[in-house]
């Protein structure tokens, strides 16, 4: 069956956008707020009509993720690119662990559904919602292991709010990983279809 590289590339960009947010937060304590909102919002999209709808109404909302995907596909084994690649591969691995634990998947769905009550009173990017998303990551995803080692500024990473945002961004990466599998993504494509993914990401960036 022919693969839909448009959908696969969008989902990969979602994973990469989360990785970039984690990197920005860990080193600087702040990040691209528009990209963060896009990623956090994707967690709540449990019944989207299509792949793009998970993230928004236009490919431009994934511009940071598409740029990061190009970086990852061209990554050296050292430096910031290697760090982004490690985060992306770690998220993919954790998503596979989650898929193998039906109870964890059910719990994840239930916990996300419970956010509706809080979202009636708090903004998506509020400390309350971000902390709730972080708690879901800690309670449901972290126990599946192996834990993702986040590297950055030790002083920055001691900040509780930064920690919560990092975990919320990681949860968004898991959500994108689930989507990636659903649309036919696989790690083999990162080796054998790299050029097709790169070309698609470039095309999407050009039109975003």
UniProtKB/Swiss-Prot annotation:
It is a peripheral membrane protein. InterPro entries: HflD (IPR007451), HflD-like_sf (IPR035932). This is High frequency lysogenization protein HflD homolog. It is found in: Cytoplasm; Cell inner membrane. HAMAP family: HflD_protein. Pfam families: DUF489. Belongs to the HflD family. NCBIfam families: PRK00218.1-2, PRK00218.1-4, PRK00218.1-5. Its main location: cytoplasm. The gene is hflD. Keywords: Cell inner membrane, Cell membrane, Cytoplasm, Membrane. GO terms for cellular component: cytoplasm; plasma membrane. Transmembrane segments: none annotated. It comes from Edwardsiella ictaluri (strain 93-146). It comes from the Bacteria.
């Amino acid at each position: 069956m022919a693969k839909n590289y448009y959908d696969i590339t969008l989902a990969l960009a979602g994973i990469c956008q989360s990785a970039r947010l984690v990197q920005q937060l860990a080193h600087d304590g702040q990040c691209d707020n528009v990209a963060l909102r896009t990623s956090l919002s994707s967690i709540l999209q449990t019944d989207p009509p299509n792949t793009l709808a998970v993230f928004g109404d236009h490919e431009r909302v994934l511009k940071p993720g598409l740029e990061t995907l190009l970086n990852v596909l061209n990554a050296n084994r050292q430096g910031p690119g290697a760090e982004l690649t490690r985060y992306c591969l770690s998220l993919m691995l954790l998503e596979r662990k989650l898929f193998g634990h039906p109870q964890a998947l059910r719990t994840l769905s239930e916990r996300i559904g419970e956010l509706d009550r809080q979202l009636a009173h708090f903004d998506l990017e509020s400390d309350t919602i971000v902390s709730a998303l972080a708690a879901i990551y800690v309670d449901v995803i972290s126990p599946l292991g192996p834990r993702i080692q986040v590297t950055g500024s030790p002083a920055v990473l001691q900040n509780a709010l930064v920690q919560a945002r990092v975990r919320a961004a990681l949860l968004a990466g898991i959500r994108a990983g689930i989507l990636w599998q659903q649309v036919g993504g696989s790690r083999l494509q990162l080796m054998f279809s790299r050029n097709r993914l790169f070309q698609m990401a470039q095309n999407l960036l050009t039109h975003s």
